[in-house]
Regions:
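Residues forming the flavin
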Residues: 1-287
Length: 287
């Protein structure tokens, strides 16, 4: 495919892909798909390289959409979720400073199949950050600017990311700004304690007020409420925002089509949180 500079959705924009691509390494089915929006053939009709070179003849640009009807015994709805856009937090500098990234982007950096093959490197210059700051609740529990609910997963994946950083960057310093640590699961509290006590992650209870760049460094300004709201200023090489989880676009429409319940935030609702946590109110449809 000649179109090789399309930002990769799976790598959260940190890498590039072609117009014909496998969505991600463990995709099921593990088959290539064509991005019609960026495919040169669909845009101007002047390309057809992949159709000519496909060894199995599986690509047919003239193929039209068709409706398929299948009878099944059960349906499992697994649509996942999205992360909240960070545009409403201009004081954090996301989109303005290349080294302010989201937790999902850090996850791809830490992955062996990611754009840096598992090495933690700054998007701006490819250097290894020696000091990193994680900002928890970047949008969660904030009715004024974000969403009112707790996303539930941010505390734990932030602790995991901080531990991964300490394991990969020996001698590096990591800081986590948090409101409260909500480690509600088996051995979750012990996991966070291990990050603090064994891996040396510095937890600061307080909100970040502003992030700006100075002399090639990111200046993170906040407060430490455990020290009487004392001002805290950290000169960091990279900042990671634990952005809030929100329902997928179109989740409400899908729920109405399938006649399943959903909450005010468009998340699908289970039949009973304790007795039937994976069943919906419609028989045969599961979450």
């Amino acid at each position: 495919c000649p179109n090789k500079k399309i930002p990769s959705e799976f790598n959260a924009g940190l890498g590039m892909r072609t117009a014909i691509y496998v969505p991600f390494p463990q995709a099921v089915p593990n088959k290539p798909v064509i991005d019609k929006e960026h495919c040169t053939h669909y845009r101007n009709g002047k390309c057809g390289v992949c159709e000519k070179l496909c060894p199995t003849g599986a690509i047919r640009f003239g193929q039209e959409d068709r409706i398929i009807t299948e009878e099944v015994g059960a349906i499992v709805v697994t649509t996942g979720f999205n992360v909240l856009n960070t545009d409403f937090f201009p004081e954090y500098g996301y989109g303005k400073y290349k080294d302010v990234i989201t937790g999902l982007q850090f996850e791809r950096l830490a992955s062996a199949s990611g754009p840096t093959f598992g090495e933690i490197r700054r998007p701006s210059d490819g250097q290894i950050p020696q000091k990193i700051v994680f900002v928890a609740c970047a949008g969660s529990r904030d009715p004024a600017k974000g969403i009112p609910y707790c996303s539930k997963i941010c505390c734990m994946y932030t602790a995991k990311h901080a531990m991964l950083y300490q394991h990969k960057v020996h001698g590096g310093e990591s800081y986590v700004f948090y409101m409260d640590i909500r480690a509600g699961g088996k051995n979750y509290e012990e996991f966070v304690r291990r990050a603090i006590e064994e891996d040396g992650v510095n937890y600061v209870r307080g909100r970040v007020a502003r992030i700006y760049e100075k002399n090639g460094k990111l200046i993170v300004k906040g407060v430490d409420t455990l020290l009487g709201a004392s001002p805290v200023e950290i000169e960091a090489d990279m900042v990671v925002l634990a952005t809030a989880g929100v329902a997928n676009k179109g989740a409400e429409e899908l729920a109405q089509k399938m006649h399943i319940s959903y909450d005010p935030y468009q998340f699908f609702a289970e039949s009973h949180p304790k007795l039937k946590p994976v069943e919906t109110n419609t028989a045969g449809i599961y979450l």
